[in-house]
Amino acid sequence: MKNRTWKQKVGLRFAGTLLLSALLIGVTACGAKEKQTSAPAANASSTSAAQGEIKLPETLRIGFISANNNKTITGPEGWAQSKGYLESELKKYGVKEFKYFNFPNGPNLNEAVTAGTLDVGIYGDTPAINGKAAGLKTKLINISQINMNVWLVAKPDGPKTLADLKGKKVATSQGSYMSRYLISLLKEQGLENDVKVLHLLPADGEAALARGDIAAYAYPTGFGPLILKKGYVAIDEASKHPDLLGTSLTVVTEDYLKANPAFPKLWNDIRTRAVKEIRANSEEYFKLYADGSGYPVDVVKASFQIDQWPEEAFPAKGLTLVNATKKFLVDQGLAKKDFTQDEWIAK
C-alpha cells in the first residue's frame, strides 16, 4: 500500500510536470506571436507619444529683414513657408497661429525682441551679435546664410577707388553687416579718420547718391546688383575681402527656448529640408525669391549662389565668419561686451 502510494505520487508529480511544461510552451509561443504582431503598433504608438510630449505655444512670432517692406521671408524658411510645411510641421506640435513681422534693418528687430514681441529672429550677424553683447536674451539656433556680399557703390562720374573717398561722406545702414564691412574696409585702408560714415537705409541710398549728399553707399544683397544695373559702379565688394563677408543668423529668445527646448531641432529640420529642395530646384527658388523680394530674377542671381545656404545648422565657415565679426565689433568698441560663441549657441 505504501509502495503503491509512492508510485501514485511519482506519477502525479510527473504528470503535473508535463502539464506545466506544456502550459509554459503554449504561453511562450503565444507571447512570441503576440509580440511579433503588435511590435509595429508599439513603434507607431511611441512615435505619437514622442510628438505628444512636445507641446509648443499656440502662437509663434517670427521676425525677419525686408528692406523693401515685403511680407514674405526670402531664405529657405521662405521656401518652406511657400510650400506650406513651415506651418504644417509646427502645427503638429500645437502651433495654431503664425505671426510674421518684417523690419527694415537689424537694430529694429532687436528692439522688437527687447519689447517681447518676437520669439524668433532671422537677420544679419552684426545686429544679432550687438544685441547679444548689449544683454539681449537670445540663443543662436543656426547660421542661415554665409558669404553674404556687400557692394560699395558710387555714381559713374564719382570716386573710382577707395583712396578717392578721402575727405568725403559715405553711408550704409547702421548696425548692419554692411556697416561692419564698411568700417573694417576704411580701417584697412587707413581712411577711418578721413571718411565720415552716415546712417542711411538702403531704400534711401540712391537718392542721396544722385544728389551728391554722399560719395558712396555700401549696399546689401539685392540692392547692390539692382543699383549697378541702373548704371552705378562698384568701387569695392566684400567678396574681395573674404573675412568681411556677412552671415545671416537665426536666434530664439531665451524665454521661448527655456519653455520649448525641442524647438531648435524642429526648426532646423524644416530648414534643412528646404535647403535640400532649393538646391534641387534652384530656378524655381530664384523666382520665388524674386517674387518675395520684389527684385528681378537676374538681380537675385547676381546677389548670391545657392550654396550660400548650408544644410547644417552651424557650418565651419559660418562659425569662423561669425566669430571674426564678433571679435571686430568687440575690439572696435561697437559691441558692449564680449561673450563666447559656445555660450550663445542653443544646446
Residue map of PLM features:
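C-terminal motif of bacterial Sec signal peptides marking the signal peptidase cleavage site
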Residues: I25-A29
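Short, low-complexity, disordered segments immediately C-terminal to signal peptides
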Residues: G31-I54
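Extracytoplasmic "Venus flytrap"
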Residues: S48-Q81, G175
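A local structural motif
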Residues: L56-T59, E89-N102, T117-D119, E188-H199, ...
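Secondary-structure end/capping motifs
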Residues: A67-K71, K258-L334
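Short helices/loops that flank or line small-molecule/ion binding pockets
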Residues: P107-L118, A133-G135, K166, E188, ...
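Pocket-lining segment of extracytoplasmic ligand-binding domains
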Residues: T126, D194-A290
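Flexible hinge/capping segments at coil-to-helix
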Residues: A154-V170, Y256-A262
